[in-house]
Swiss-Prot record:
This is Phospholipase D2. Residues 65-195 form the PX domain. PANTHER family: PHOSPHOLIPASE D (PTHR18896), PHOSPHOLIPASE D2 (PTHR18896:SF121). It is an enzyme of class 3 (hydrolase). It comes from the Eukaryota. It holds the Pfam family PLDc. It comes from Mus musculus.
Length: 933
């Protein structure tokens, strides 16, 4: 020992690092010319956590750990103890920097632990790195020398030298992996396997704590927690990152709980708020977590550090943003739209192939056997096969499904879960909720590696795939038939037929017409359930979108919130078999490993409808965004939606989307402004029923509330517009649907195009796309759960608006022009100018096209719904007359040549003389009206 050391430690309490000397080959060699970031642990390490005393590889190999004692704090902790010194140690490992505070006795305890570790390993050389624990510290506690009470400890002139000595001592040990990775050292340095994962953000705050049970704010949760006496304290390893915290079981390494920071975040220290000496209380909307520290100073420091971490890159989640959304607008986001399932499914398939770490999927309905690229000639693009291959590569697949009431819905989520879970252990599926409820998880989302996210109206399910051709038939190539044999007992009903010569676009249950017949026997996916030789399929029109970067992180965070909420609330998911998910930091969100081509930069904000039952918090930002966008629109609104139930009466219907449309049109009328509203709806609701007899009770119930919104009753849009402007409302608003035709069995056929889109375009600059219908179920927040995004263009291009030059957004304009092109049949109309959606010439062309098409379809097919059938009696007489398509197919074909596109007027007078509410004695009549609205 040198003289300096004797002066620093006059009582013999010095640390002699030579006692821990290792052979040269046991010292880490540090490589030069390498980026330390490339050596950090991969994100997938979060799924393979080890017990804290199992010597897991915490530090990145070859990347040095450098310690610097940057200061001291001296304080008096009591008359019997005297003055204590706290050393602030700043550590650096690659790009990670953090600070820990230690007393000198902590260095002494570490030194003795490392000595014991070296002795034990020298006695058991073959067991090196296999020992899972060192002798208990408590057993050797009486041998620990006391901290010096005087001399150098109380002398300021020795402080700098002592700091330097401790710094050199640590740095020498940290060059040797034998000590650096030992659990006593990692605990001293407050690091774990989660410390140095770049995608989790900064190092954060870590350490051993005791946490109190309870404190959850979950509906239906009954337990003893805050304000109760029957709680328990448990030892845990706490990890605090920039937007969440978690704690782990030290003995297993398993994550026991994840708490996402949100606007309810608050940190309080002290006995008054925690009911615990040296307590720290961390509040969010989901839980009040109480921790116990070893001293008041530690509690105060931890409270301060947790608050500062939350105010870092994750501070966006500590407050509500525009439209009361949990996520702020994200400028510079790459986004791409998709109309119809063909392009959307193909892009989803490409993204799945690029997945390296995680795939998140949540759907109202998911069909494992769906083909994402068609026609399929092998299983390569089948969803379940793709997910299995990625799982075999190590990708973690997490799927959330809506658990339906089986008597009401036939989507068979239980079959989907069993099928997917049997594929590979890396595929986890949870269903929610367990309790019978009137509401559903209706959102559709797929996230890859928390960096690319797809959402919109498209479930990955049967019947959704379509393209701009909207085919009514799918008979394949008669010369190359695909035999879809009925499985025999003991065979695999999901086995794929030979597809080597397949020409079908829709195999088995995928060929559908949901009004003719709802899906049945979904566990036999490749068996037809309607006769494709006699029954046309119903085309499916839908809209989706993909976003990248920080917006994708926001969507992933929503999924993680729902996943962890479900895991917390359902007992069967509390096992380690279903891991907690962790959100990646927004600080690394712009490091895109891949992109979906064809995107455009815009400002994107994630919106949602959630409630305490669905996600543990309440939000209705989708409704707020709709109302604001309509209110602030200057020139036009283009809306496609599966439902349109609005116009609040304060009792039955509560959302005010329809009211805002009325107010905006009245404002334009008063100011003499040119303003247009284009509204596209499905001609019939998507429920099984025979429309020739008036449809089923479900169809009529939805029609009742749709017509109540549009044109029937004092609260309806047209009633209020007519009262103010008479027939002039036609200059402002167009209400239409879509229809197409084809040939089957040598005869012309027609079917409506089922509009399932949930989209709004305003002024060729603003777009809303998501899963939310325009009704109370989707928009109020406290009913169905939904997702959407608000897109505001930042890149403009020249266009026209009411005959005047106009700067239109590239995203909105390209989407709107594509929609208009398909709807109006622009491929056969080469001189059609779609730039100006407001001018009189275009609006008149739109209205005339819809009227002409509707007239031709009615003359040829006597199709329903129709304005000619205002009562059930008139309906019976109407359908009793044979159509021209039946009487004279050739003449019908010649007339159909005059059809332009797919646009038809919505029949506003259909069954207007009838009450369409379900009879009280029917099962539909016994359902609360809120289910239909």
């Amino acid at each position: 020992m040198t003289v300096t050391q004797k002066n620093l430690f006059p009582y013999g309490d010095y640390l002699n690092s030579s006692q821990l000397h290792m052979e040269p080959d046991e010292v880490d060699t540090l490589r030069e010319g390498e980026d330390p970031a490339d050596r950090m642990h991969p994100y997938l390490a979060i799924y393979d956590l080890q017990p804290l005393k199992a010597h897991p590889l915490v530090f990145a190999p070859g990347v040095p750990v450098i310690a610097q004692v940057v200061g001291t704090e001296r304080y008096t902790s009591g008359s019997k103890v005297g003055t204590c010194t706290l050393y602030s140690v700043r550590l650096t490992h690659g790009d990670f920097t953090w600070t820990t505070k230690k007393k000198f006795r902590h260095f002494q305890e570490l030194h003795r632990d490392l000595q014991r570790h070296k002795v034990l390993m020298s006695l058991l050389p073959l067991a090196r790195f296999a020992v899972t624990h060192s002798p208990a510290r408590e057993a050797a506690a009486e041998d620990i020398p006391s901290l010096p009470r005087g001399g150098s400890e109380g002398s300021a002139r020795h402080t700098a030298s002592k700091q330097k000595y401790l710094e050199n001592y640590l740095n020498r040990l940290l060059t040797m992996s034998f000590y650096r990775n030992y659990h006593a050292m990692t605990e001293f340095l407050e690091v774990s396997q989660l410390s140095f994962i770049p995608d989790l953000g900064s190092k954060g705050l870590e350490g051993v704590i005791r946490k109190r049970s309870g404190g959850h704010r979950v509906p239906g949760f009954t337990f003893c927690g805050r304000d109760q006496v029957c709680y328990r304290w448990s030892k845990r390893w706490l990890v605090v990152k920039d937007s969440f915290l978690l704690y782990m079981r030290p003995e297993t390494g398993a994550i026991s709980f994840v708490q996402l920071f949100d606007p309810g975040f608050e940190v309080q220290v002290g006995k008054r708020s925690t009911e615990t000496r040296y307590g720290v209380r961390i509040d969010t909307s989901h839980r009040s977590l109480i921790l116990k520290c070893s001293s008041y100073r530690q509690a105060r420091w931890w409270g301060q550090e947790i608050t500062e971490l939350a105010q870092g890159s994750g501070r966006d989640f500590l407050q509500l943003h525009q439209h009361d959304s949990y996520a702020p607008p994200r400028p510079g986001t790459l986004a791409r739209w998709f109309v119809n399932g063909a392009g959307y499914f193909a892009a989803v398939a490409d993204a799945i192939l690029r997945a390296q770490e995680e795939i998140f999927i949540t759907d109202w309905w998911l069909s494992p056997e769906i083909y994402l690229k068609r026609p399929a000639h092998s299983d390569d693009w089948r969803l379940d096969i793709m997910l299995k291959r990625k799982a075999e590569e190590g990708v973690r697949v997490s799927i959330l499904l809506f658990k339906e009431v089986e008597l009401a819905l036939g989507i068979n989520s239980g079959y989907s879960k069993r099928t997917l879970m049997l594929l590979h252990p890396n595929i986890k599926v949870m269903r929610h909720p367990d309790l019978v409820t009137l509401w559903a998880h209706h959102e559709k989302l797929l996230v890859v590696d928390q960096v690319v996210a797809f959402l919109g109206g498209l479930d990955l399910a049967f019947g959704r795939w379509d393209d701009v051709q909207y085919r009514l038939t799918d008979l394949g190539d008669p010369s190359e038939p695909v035999h879809l044999q009925t499985p025999t007992l003991g065979s695999d009903p999901a086995a794929t037929p030979d597809l080597s010569h397949n020409q079908f676009f829709w195999l088995g249950k995928d060929y559908s017409n949901l009004i003719t017949k709802d899906w049945v026997q979904l566990d036999r996916p490749f068996e037809d359930f309607i006769d494709r030789e006699t029954t046309p399929r119903m085309p499916w029109r839908d809209v989706g979108v993909v976003v990248h970067g920080v917006a994708a992180r926001d969507l992933a965070r929503h999924f993680i919130q729902r996943w962890n909420f479900t895991k917390t609330t359902k007992a069967r998911y509390k096992t380690p078999l279903y891991p907690y998910l962790l959100p990646k930091s927004t600080s690394t969100a712009n490091n895109l490993p891949f992109m979906i081509p064809g995107g455009q930069c815009a400002t994107v904000q994630v919106l949602r409808s959630v409630d305490r039952w669905s996600a543990g918090t309440l939000e209705n930002s989708i409704l707020n965004a709709y109302l604001h966008t309509i209110r602030e629109s200057q020139h036009f609104l283009y809306i496609e939606n599966q439902f349109f139930i609005s116009c609040s009466d304060g009792r039955t219907v509560l959302n005010k989307v329809g009211d805002e449309i009325v107010d905006r049109i009245l404002k334009a009328h008063e100011q003499g402004q040119c303003f247009r509203v284009y509204l596209l709806l499905p001609l019939l609701p998507g429920f099984e029923g025979d429309i020739s007899t008036g449809g089923g009770n479900s169809i009529q119930a939805i029609l009742h509330f749709t017509y109540r919104t549009l044109c029937r009753g004092e609260h309806s849009i047209l009633h209020r517009l007519k009262a103010a402007m008479g027939t002039a409302w036609r200059d402002y608003m167009s209400i239409c649907g879509l229809r197409t035709h084809g040939e089957l069995g040598g005869h012309p056929i027609s079917e409506l195009i089922y509009i399932h889109s949930k989209m709004l375009i305003a002024d060729d600059r603003t777009v809303i796309i998501g899963s939310a219908n325009i009704n109370d179920r989707s928009l109020l927040g406290k009913r169905d759960s939904e997702l959407a995004i608000l897109i505001k263009d930042t890149e403009m291009e020249p266009s026209l608006m009411d005959g005047v030059e106009y700067q239109a957004g590239r995203f909105a304009l390209s989407l709107r022009k594509h929609c208009f092109s398909v709807i109006l049949g622009a491929n056969t109309w080469p001189d059609l100018d779609l730039r100006d959606p407001v001018c009189d010439d275009f609006f008149q062309l739109w209205q005339e096209t819809a009227e002409n098409n509707a007239t031709i379809y009615e003359q040829i097919f006597r199709c329903l719904p129709s304005n000619a059938t205002r009562s059930l009696r008139a309906l019976r007489e109407y359908v009793a007359v044979e159509s021209l398509a039946t009487v004279s197919p050739s003449l019908a074909q010649s007339e159909l040549a005059h059809i332009q596109g797919h646009l038809v007027h919505f029949p506003l007078k259909f069954l207007e003389d009838e009450s369409l509410l379900p009879p009280l004695g029917s099962k539909e009549g016994m359902i609360p009206l809120e289910v239909w609205t």
